[in-house]
């Protein structure tokens, strides 16, 4: 009888440890952002997350050879056919992102700050059927994760051109009204609970 209680206690202890460890899938928790392994990982590993649109506005030539990653919400999608090649330009409102995936009882995993550093744009070639299939997954209102080189500064946006990689996250997977934060090290606050 004593051995059964010992085994039961050990199993119970292991179960409690697994459920409270924050491991996604077993229980609620958070983890570092996971880029898509096949398409996004190499860019994520190389890109700087500490260069923001206002840095580029203040020093336009200072980051032209620096691969950066910016996040935002797509506000407009524009096709440009002339001059060739056919391009798609995505405009986005920049939002700060803490690079954390929150896995809990709410559906959303990504909590962008309502704040950001203005508009940015990226262009993508859309000449072939495969290019168009890729572009078709993006829509106004999607969260955009864009990797590129900030080489163009306009009065109303900063462009990552050439763009190296893009990822769309549909609106049901992110929110902008839960956490308010800025650049790393700046104060943050909870605006409301996610559920």
Residue ranges: model-predicted function:
Residues 23-195:
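OB-fold and OB-like single-stranded nucleic-acid-recognition modules
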Residues 1-23:
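Sec-dependent bacterial lipoprotein signal peptides
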